[in-house]
């Protein structure tokens, strides 16, 4: 075998080795890429019910952790949530506006002895069974249910408060609490009082189940253009919240006499 044949065989062998090396390297790169893809967590798609349950448990856990730090405890329920938008208009959805108002009540509270907890602090749908379970765990002194109205006529405007006679506290009846809350909110927003009424609306039935002072307040009407525009603004929501907080403090004073 001459030198030329030897060199030819050498380069052929070398070429084969390079080809095998390239195949091995490419295979390794593809394998590592596959492993990395497998390690990337896949997006978990939760149902509305699962989202609600998770949010409820987190909120309850945090609330229970802080509950014993306060001498007087209030639970506020921002009505509706999640797929249940409540009343709707061009100015917004009831679920969003009342949640914002309720958060402003918590933010405005400066009394370190008063704890204010929300049944929901996010856009999740809760049923009355969950709300009652939350109340059973927290054991508040006062309950405020916050809604909006939407009448069939655009002339409807103002604040309405609903109460139940199923429970009576000699220091503060639900009728008296309803009157306090309406006066406080109307004063804070310089608005209109539509009166206090015994509860009939289905979405407010929770207040009939409680053995503490409790009312449902509809703090405005989305069917009215002027009031609807105001309810959609943060400054006005803060004024509504101020009125609710003032009412809470007056109710506290009555209960502690």
Please tell me what each predicted stretch does.
Residues 1-20:
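N-terminal Sec-pathway targeting helices
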Residues 81-83, 121-126, 148-153, 167-169, ...:
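Solvent-exposed loop/turn segments at secondary-structure junctions
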Residues 84-92, 151-180:
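A short, glycine/acidic-enriched catalytic loop
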